[in-house]
UniProtKB/Swiss-Prot annotation:
This is Na(+)-translocating NADH-quinone reductase subunit B. The keyword RNA-binding does not apply. It comes from Chlamydia pneumoniae. Belongs to the NqrB/RnfD family. It catalyses: a ubiquinone + n Na(+)(in) + NADH + H(+) = a ubiquinol + n Na(+)(out) + NAD(+). It comes from the Bacteria.
Amino acid sequence: MLKKFINSLWKLCQQDKYQRFTPIVDAIDTFCYEPIETPSKPPFIRDSVDVKRWMMLVVIALFPATFVAIWNSGLQSIVYSSGNPVLMEQFLHISGFGSYLSFVYKEIHIVPILWEGLKIFIPLLTISYVVGGTCEVLFAVVRGHKIAEGLLVTGILYPLTLPPTIPYWMAALGIAFGIVVSKELFGGTGMNILNPALSGRAFLFFTFPAKMSGDVWVGSNPGVIKDSLMKMNSSTGKVLIDGFSQSTCLQTLNSTPPSVKRLHVDAIAANMLHIPHVPTQDVIHSQFSLWTETHPGWVLDNLTLTQLQTFVTAPVAEGGLGLLPTQFDSAYAITDVIYGIGKFSAGNLFWGNIIGSLGETSTFACLLGAIFLIVTGIASWRTMAAFGIGAFLTGWLFKFISVLIVGQNGAWAPARFFIPAYRQLFLGGLAFGLVFMATDPVSSPTMKLGKWIYGFFIGFMTIVIRLINPAYPEGVMLAILLGNVFAPLIDYFAVRKYRKRGV
């Protein structure tokens, strides 16, 4: 019956006044059935994977990240909006996968979590496909070309890059920009030089920065979450330095000025987190011995919060560590990020028990997608490997050069340079961008050497933007778009290198 209906639509489109709607009927036919076109010129390739199925494989690879997006957004919305400080403390102090499952089953249960997550994610997904599809159809009808299957991937990638609180009209505007400006104006699917989903996110990021950063990472109503956090902080007597908040790892990193040095963080870690043998302990002990001349009875590594703040913010000449008093909160916050304590532990970062954009939180989910894409031959493992290597080496070099140049184990170097290199791979959208964005075959190089250069360049730029540029808390988006721009040039030189080798 469906085939008969489609055939009737084809007959209708043969009439002159309905010919302009041929791309729509062709899209319906191609979506439901195998294309029946026979190539008229070589290469003649017989393969079971056409463009439609190629796109569907990418969508399947996105299933783990999509599920985590629904799950995380639902769970976090329930916990953060509960107004219950006990529940919040339990959630933030989850230390392993077993304790996470125990918390879910005992405190909240699965169905409410999924329902809350679906209420957040499904509207954004629907807007992405409806608005993006409408733009595709309009251009196909006007230009008289076929509707490509690229929207299948773009339509799901785009909402996964957004914060859950994004207004619906902004989400619609972003996907429209991504489809129209970064794809259709370049000629449509296969002709774009920039990733459409990432272009749409970049448009929103620069046009509406207040809605793409800050307290936008939990629930669907920022006002409700803000009131709940204030209620919990008030009832427990928490202050800014240790209160509940929506701060992400990268926001904490970005808000830490270069004047916060490594020894400031180490002093806080040794006292408040009871971490023995911090790297700059010799410098801290040297300063503290001078400090005790005027403050007898104080014991290093056993200071109260008030004593610690006084010592860390006192002038160096008096035996203190010279931190500005207004920056103590920043130093305290980044200590958790550098040492992987509490909600910023390596386990939470890997499994995805953190806040952030919908699809970027779980490195594990992204790895599952990466394995699927590599096994099916859809994505380039070279680009992924080069991206990861570039990011890791750049993060390590920042730490190594700081220690080498500054000396004293980098005691007076900016603390932000000392996040362990491996942890950089778990932060923000790096894993998601590495697997699903950087490997876009249209906007990335095609030569093997080009893929290595391209991936390494993006990884390098990601960490440089994170650690050097104070304006942007995340470098993945800008690094990939910059890599997209240079991809044709990289391919050009890769081809020249290949030809010279063959001569």
